[in-house]
Regions:
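Long, low-complexity intrinsically disordered regulatory regions in eukaryotic proteins
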Residues: 4, 11-23
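Catalytic-core regions of glycoside hydrolase
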Residues: 151, 227-359
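Structural motif
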Residues: 24-29, 59-63, 82-84, 129, ...
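Charged, often glycine-rich, active-site loop that binds/positions anionic groups
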Residues: 61-69, 308-315
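Short acidic low-complexity segments
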Residues: 46-62
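Feature activates predominantly on carbohydrate-active enzymes
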Residues: 2, 6-11, 28, 32-38, ...
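A mature extracytoplasmic/lumenal domain signature
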Residues: 61, 131, 177-179, 262, ...
């Protein structure tokens, strides 16, 4: 299937041709390799220039910068890009190429003095792709991650997608629908580890962490247990063991995205527990692996009678989560939908977004 490069096509800046632009760096590694490749492609497209060895551009680290931040300085045909990490350097490279295009100037005339730091540590996209290849609420074709319960490995397209994400600072992605069912429940098993390892090889060098949406009832559906009660020590052990297995096979995985107690799916409420009980149990399981739990707040009773005007479904998430503010583990992020209900013609911002102060 054909695909576009979006804003990374690097069209020629007319009248600004130059034969070569040189680069020097002592940095090594896969992310730096991606940065060099981006510069080479960008300069070839914008100026028709080859990327050679020299000191026109210097890539370096400055650990005083934000870990994902960068500093870009350019004048008189020379440019320095410093990052707080290799990913910061990559972000600086994308910033240079972006600024060159908006300036529309010859390389020797280009000037820049820019320093950026991340204001949000997690900048994630959630795909609602199903493993049969369909996309829930999808609007532009089928999934390029899944088909017929298998993981697709389209390296050129996935690489182009990872580039696009990195170019705008996206650093996390879940590839499967948060409504986890059927084959998707098995993504955390050896049935799919091999293919997911290929995804890690593609996304990780671009600073994009791979996350998986999981089934809260996995101890029952995968492990044959009678319960998924988050306060049951046997359930907690099952998840701790599963986390060790997953990260042993998928080192560098970002973590899990969880939708529980919503639209008929089981969760902590099924067992008389609260949302922090569920999120914290999983957080403790993945913490030794450096994992992160993203816990959705779109929780309500889907069997409520919409004709009962005394029931205010829109406040359900607020009522459930506000009393728990400050009780979640540090490796838990609560994911709040912009509005408290689906499919509204106009939608107020969820009061949870401004209400939670310690989570």
């Amino acid at each position: 299937m054909a695909f576009t490069k979006c804003w990374l096509a690097y069209p020629e800046i007319r009248g600004c041709h130059c034969d070569a632009i040189s680069l020097h760096t002592e940095l090594t590694g896969e992310t730096i390799d991606r940065a060099k490749a981006e510069l080479a492609e960008g300069f070839k497209g914008l100026y028709g220039a080859a990327l050679t060895e020299g000191d026109d551009i210097t890539l370096a680290l400055d650990m005083a910068l934000d870990p994902e931040g960068y500093r870009l300085k350019a004048a008189d045909g020379h440019c320095t890009i410093e990052g707080g990490s290799e990913v910061g350097v990559l972000y600086g490279v994308f910033a240079l190429l972006r600024n060159l295009q908006t300036a529309g100037k010859a390389w020797a005339q280009f000037t820049a003095d820019e320093e950026k730091a991340s204001s949000n540590r997690l900048r994630m996209l959630n795909h609602w792709d199903n493993m049969d290849g369909s996309i829930e609420r999808g609007y532009s074709g089928d999934s390029f991650f899944f088909k017929d319960s298998e993981i697709l490995i389209d390296v050129p397209r996935l690489t182009a997608y990872a580039r696009m994400l990195a170019s705008v600072g996206i650093n996390g992605i879940t590839i499967n629908n948060v409504n986890v069912k059927d084959a998707a429940s098995w993504l955390i098993t050896d049935r799919y580890f091999g293919a997911l390892q290929e995804y890690l090889k593609i996304f990780t060098p671009y600073g994009v962490k791979l996350y998986l949406s999981i089934n809260f009832a996995a101890p029952m559906e995968l492990g044959g247990m009678d319960s998924a009660d988050p306060c049951d020590p046997a359930v907690a052990k099952w998840w701790a063991d599963k986390a060790q297995e997953v990260w042993a096979n998928l080192p560098g995985l970002g973590g899990f995205l969880v939708k529980a107690d919503s639209e008929g799916r089981p969760g902590p409420f099924t067992y008389g527990r609260n949302q922090a009980d569920g999120a914290n149990m999983l957080a403790d399981a993945v913490a030794p692996c450096g994992g992160h739990i993203v816990w959705r707040c779109f929780v309500y009773n889907c069997q409520q009678d919409w004709r009962n005007t005394k029931i205010d479904r829109a406040r359900a998430g607020y009522d459930y989560f506000m009393p728990l503010d400050g009780t979640f583990r540090d490796n838990v992020t609560l994911q709040i939908k912009n509005g408290p209900m689906d499919f509204q013609v106009r939608e107020p911002v969820s009061p949870l977004i401004g209400g939670l102060q310690h989570t």
